[in-house]
């Protein structure tokens, strides 16, 4: 069974979000199950030179894009037993950021065409083409509409994964007409047309044999207007080929027993070492070293989606408790400024790191007691899974993957691995935070809760089995 992942980003090459983590970890887990996965992505100039040096030029071809042929170098390399192909074209990929350019429609039209034009030259017979998010959605659409009559492509099945429905790849009609050479028959509401523009993600949904969302709850949510980003009707129409498979975490990266970034390695049987990480975190940020004061942390993009309006509304009320708070992330200036002001107002209780620091993030996960993630929506979420693996108890809103992975603690049965609230309401969140703090001070209960969190399986194994079953079903 041969699978080709078409992605716009992938760890360890380049990362802007969770898509890169999925693309980096899932193929390795599938390989353990006997599934051969190769990955194709752009050769961005942002990729570390050391990784590019590990690739060799496999072939040079031309990619037809509108009225012209564009250069396409196919670089080939291997990392952790997985084969990668990098699509080389400096005109499109020598940029200072992955996305957000005026010609993104052209860049990813080129990449979509390049993926398909490369397939006969890969020395790899593709059984299933698995595309991800808007950037590669048109790979599946073009395969069905323009390539599948060719014997080299006719057997290929397609899977399309929605990581975040909010970003759809909406561009002027000229992208469709001039670059992809698709005619008027594709510019209507049953095809690519979307409020007078062209929607790449819509193409992926329409044309793919199977669609997955990154959690079962998110799969249901996106079929409703509130979460559906104007594609809810289309997703209801194609509900029969839509499924939800929750993401995992790469346990070779996120594992407190082996993590080289943290001060003291530990497991569920050596939680005193977790306290050593807490003290190290307090020292790093210059917080008073109080063992019995819970540290509440957030490692997040500072955006509206992450529920920061709730946090902002009741933050001072949380500060009335005996707590310390650490925020690590960057994003919208209004939230950055708010947290910086709170750090100024509460210097003994609040510390903020604007930006991202991988090593520090690991230490925050290891050294905190509670992890706050009150998202407005969350397709899957990685932070709560990492927090659970490190015995840092998540406080989440019941949406998307947060609902699928965090079970609220039940004091009657002792079951659960975190705390959650349903409504997007600041005082519901506050009540849940206060409830978590209360249980934190009940040491036998808290220790049991931490052990329950740490002993669950958050690896990619279950997800990989579900994807293998999906691929197998397509090939039967």
From Swiss-Prot:
GO biological process terms, semicolon-separated: glycogen biosynthetic process
Its pathway, per UniProt, is: Glycan biosynthesis; glycogen biosynthesis
Q: Which organism is it from?
A: Bacillus cereus (strain ZK / E33L)
Protein name as it appears in the record: Glycogen synthase
Name the residues that bind ADP-alpha-D-glucose.
15
Q: Which UniProt keywords apply?
A: Glycogen biosynthesis, Glycosyltransferase, Transferase
Q: Does the keyword Transferase apply?
A: yes
What family does the entry list?
Belongs to the glycosyltransferase 1 family. Bacterial/plant glycogen synthase subfamily.
Name the source's superkingdom.
Bacteria
EC number from the UniProt entry: 2.4.1.21
Q: Which InterPro entries match?
A: Glyco_trans_1 (IPR001296), GS/SS (IPR011835), Starch_synth_cat_dom (IPR013534)
Coiled-coil intervals: none
Show the catalytic activity: [(1->4)-alpha-D-glucosyl](n) + ADP-alpha-D-glucose = [(1->4)-alpha-D-glucosyl](n+1) + ADP + H(+)
What does it do?
A: Synthesizes alpha-1,4-glucan chains using ADP-glucose.
Q: Name one GO molecular function term.
A: alpha-1,4-glucan glucosyltransferase (UDP-glucose donor) activity
